[in-house]
Structure formats: C-alpha cells, structure tokens
C-alpha cells in the first residue's frame, strides 16, 4: 500500500509540474504572437520629429495668388506612429499625399469618414502613398486621444500615421495654417499642391490624377 501511495504522489506532482510548464508555454506563445506595442501602456500620442530640408512657407488658403510652395522641394519628416513604428515622409520616388489631422477639429472629424470610405471603395488612385500626421494634439481638447479616434473611424491600416510632436514640428515644416490640411508631393519630391479645409473626394482624386499624369 505504501508503494502504491508513493507512486500516486509522484504522478500527482508530475501532473502539476506538467500543467505549470504547459501554462508557462501558453503564456510565452501568446506573448510572442502579439504586438506588445498595441497595449495601451505603449501607445504615445506624440513622437520626436526630425526634419530634413527647408520648411515650406505658411499656406494661405484665402489668397488667389499661386502658392509659393509649389515646385519647392518638400522637407522630409521622420517620426513615429502611435505604437512606436518609425515612419518617414520620404516617398523614395513615389508620389505622396500627406494628410494633417487634429482630433478636436470638427472639419477633420467630418473629413476622416470620407477618406476611409474613399479607400474602402477602392477609389484612391493607385501608385501613391498616403501618410497621415496627427497634429495639434491636446489632452484638454475634445475627442482625445487621436489614436483612439482614428481607430474608431477604422482609418486605413495601409496609411501610416505619424504622431506629431507637442510643438507641431511636422505640421510647421509643411506650412500648416488650418485643418484638415493636404500636401501633395510628386515623385521628384516637389510640392505639387496644397489644400486646406473639407475637400470632396472627387476633387482630391482629380488633383492626384493630375499629379501622377493619369
């Protein structure tokens, strides 16, 4: 009887150890299979911004004169997304649409669903990169944080979003003066067009097609 009891004891202890090891393995697999940057503790609404090149002059949407920035070499802005991913506006020969958005701006809040639908419906012209910049971020203003706002709106995953610095370094480099703000940069890295305000998607499509020669 004593021998049988000892054998059962060893079996129970072995089973417990197996459960513990198995549980640890499951935790390890779960951790390695998920992006730790997506946890709320690793999301940042701001990032350090570096700018290469000269800043563009401030955009005056009320002026009938030709935008002085057209034809200028666009600065290259580098920063991080909300989860720490490195992002740069250097299109490396690809035409780029830059979209500057502020979470508290009602015009931006109306424009974002249009942009989302534009992409979902496959109406975004091919052959361009779209990069958004979340700027003007202020925890004291409504609809904060921008990361959650854009997630709720199902902002396209293929469109990277740069979290601007608290002093709007990225926005200032491109001459932002109002929201939402659009800058189209051609394949040579030159400014093709700048726009501000609520822009209809058919108008945006037409301008992009002009830029890429469609």
Task: State what each model feature region is.
Residues 97-98, 130, 182:
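Hydrophobic beta-strand anchors of alpha/beta hydrolase catalytic cores
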Residues 78-79, 100, 184:
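Hydrophobic beta-strand positions
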Residues 75-96, 120:
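A short beta-strand-turn-helix
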Residues 69-74, 92-95, 125-128, 177:
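Extracytoplasmic
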Residues 1-74:
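N-terminal targeting signals for export/organelle localization
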Residues 86-109, 115:
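Short active-site neighborhood of thiol/selenol oxidoreductases, capturing the structured segment around
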Residues 109-154, 162-172:
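Structural microenvironment flanking redox-active thiols in thiol-disulfide oxidoreductases
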Residues 94, 153-157, 163-213:
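Thiol/disulfide oxidoreductase modules built on the thioredoxin-like
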């Amino acid at each position: 009887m004593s021998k049988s009891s000892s054998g059962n004891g060893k079996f129970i202890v072995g089973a417990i150890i197996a459960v513990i090891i198995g549980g640890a393995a499951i935790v390890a697999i779960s951790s390695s299979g998920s992006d730790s940057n997506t946890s709320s503790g690793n999301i940042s609404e701001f990032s350090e911004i570096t700018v290469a090149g000269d800043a563009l002059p401030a955009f005056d949407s009320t002026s009938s004169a030709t935008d002085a920035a057209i034809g200028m070499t666009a600065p290259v802005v580098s920063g991080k997304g909300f989860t720490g991913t490195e992002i740069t506006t250097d299109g490396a020969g690809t035409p780029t649409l830059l979209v500057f958005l502020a979470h508290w701006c009602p015009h931006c809040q109306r424009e974002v669903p249009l942009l989302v639908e534009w992409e979902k419906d496959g109406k975004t012209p091919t052959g361009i990169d779209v990069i958004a910049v979340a700027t003007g971020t202020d925890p004291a203003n409504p609809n904060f944080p921008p990361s959650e706002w854009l997630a709720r709106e199902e902002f396209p995953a293929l469109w990277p979003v740069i979290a601007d610095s608290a002093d709007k370094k990225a926005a200032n480099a491109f001459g932002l003066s109002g929201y939402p703000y659009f800058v189209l940069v051609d394949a040579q890295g030159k400014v093709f067009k700048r726009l501000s305000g609520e822009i209809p998607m058919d108008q945006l499509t037409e301008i992009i097609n002009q830029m890429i020669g469609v």
